[in-house]
Amino acid sequence: MNTKRIPGFQWAMMIFIFFIVAYALPIILKDLQSSVPFKDFVFDMSTLAPFIAAFICIAIFSHRGTQLASLKLTISLKVIERAILALILPLIIFIIAMVCFNIFSDSFVLLQTKDLSVSISSIIIGQIVMAFLVELGFRSYLQHIVETKMNTFFASIIVGFMYAIWNVNIAFSFDFAIYSFLYSFAFSMIIGELIRATKGRTIYIATLFHFAMSFGLVFLFNEELGEVFAMKVIALSTAAVAILYILISLIIRTILYFFTKRNLDEVEENNYLDHVNDTDEDLTDVGDEYNVSETDETHHSANVNAATAETSSEVQDKEDPTDRHHESNASDQDNQYNSTEDTAHEDDSRANIISENTPSPSSNDSTKVDAKHSDSRANSAVEASTEKAHPESDQDEVKVNSRYTSNRQSSVVSDARTTIDEESDESSRHLSSESDDVTQQDNQPLDTADSSNADYERSPFDLKSKRGHRS
């Protein structure tokens, strides 16, 4: 059976249109027969109808490659074998018909055709052309289209009925029409079996068989004159040979299939025996595929689980050192912060102890120690008291100290320099500074408290600077 499928609706329309055109055209072509200088048995115009119908279907329908697949003109060994058989079968049919004609009739006379006034070569050429046109339409095109949906045997039956309806001669009696129909159907069945498994090389075989049968009927029998007995003998002989040939062919193919274990695809393509065990094989294949798919899914799931476990372990391993690192950094930061706070509190306590244990400022050494360890605010208070005693000589120093007091961002170096200058001035004017020391002792506790708070608010850099000046 042909594997190339045509859509069902298009398939039905192709067969229907072919048959309608092939059946209706002879009505028109018969009127043109008188314009052709040939007799009917030399060239019949109605034989153009199947060729025209096939051409129309190929032109209007799609899948042209599939439609033309059975119109191959190449030759193979099987084609030669079937061509020889196509010449032998008509000979067998005619032998049987002539024997029956002699048995059931008074006599059989060769060349019973009347009015045979044309050359033999003209008859041969005309019969070959007519056979080619008819078989190109019915066998090379129509039967191939039907075989795309069914087996060759059943396709031959359908095409045989259509060909018999198209070729039946109803110009004479009813009995003659019945035998004519039987002859055409058996004729088509033989051709269908001959072209089986030829892979599209059908035209040679069908044309040879058609030509041999038509040529023998022209010369050997007078059925064209309406003789019912002649038509009956020809029809029965053809039907008997068709049945015998199909049965023998079926038996041979069955033997080759069951006993030689050969694949029928090598014997012939469209054998219905090919599809006997298709269901069981399909079920087996589906079961195997299902089992394979389940096994693959199981392996895949196992691999996925293993990969997930490995990934989770790696992530955990990476997270543990990271957490430890963050914890260590946090602990280091806490320790550093605590040490900074301890250092700040220690400096504050030292400042308080120094301020509490400071002796009376009667000597220059005690004044120097107080000047080194006092804050900027204590220095400003000393400068203010000094300014009152010496407003004119120390005006520049007072401006510097006032600028330092307002901004609170002067460097420790400038404070030390100012303190040294103050000490030199105080040593020269000791008497005048004694009176001011009393005031300084009164304000010193307040200034020391403010200095401790300021030291607590300043950055570690300022604390380190203070530590440097305590040497």
Swiss-Prot record:
InterPro entries named in the record: Rce1/LyrA-like_dom
Compartmental location: Cell membrane; Secreted, Cell wall; Cell septum
Source domain of life: Bacteria
Residue ranges, compositional bias (Basic and acidic residues): 315-329, 367-376, 385-400, 455-465
Keyword Cell membrane part of the UniProt annotation: yes
Compositional bias segments (type: Polar residues): 301-314, 330-341, 352-366, 402-417, 440-454
Pfam families attached to this UniProt entry: Rce1-like
Gene Ontology terms describing biological process: CAAX-box protein maturation
Membrane topology: Multi-pass membrane protein
Keyword Glycosyltransferase: no
Spans annotated as Disordered: 294-471
Transmembrane segments: 9-29, 41-61, 84-104, 118-138, 152-172, 175-195, 202-222, 239-259
A molecular function GO annotation: endopeptidase activity
Annotated Gene Ontology cellular component terms: plasma membrane
UniProtKB keywords: Cell membrane, Cell wall, Membrane, Secreted, Transmembrane, Transmembrane helix
UniProt record similarity statement: Belongs to the LyrA family.
Protein purpose: Involved in bacterial cell envelope homeostasis. Regulates peptidoglycan processing, perhaps acting as a scaffold protein.
Descriptive protein name: Lysostaphin resistance protein A
Species the sequence originates in: Staphylococcus saprophyticus subsp. saprophyticus (strain ATCC 15305 / DSM 20229 / NCIMB 8711 / NCTC 7292 / S-41)
Gene: lyrA
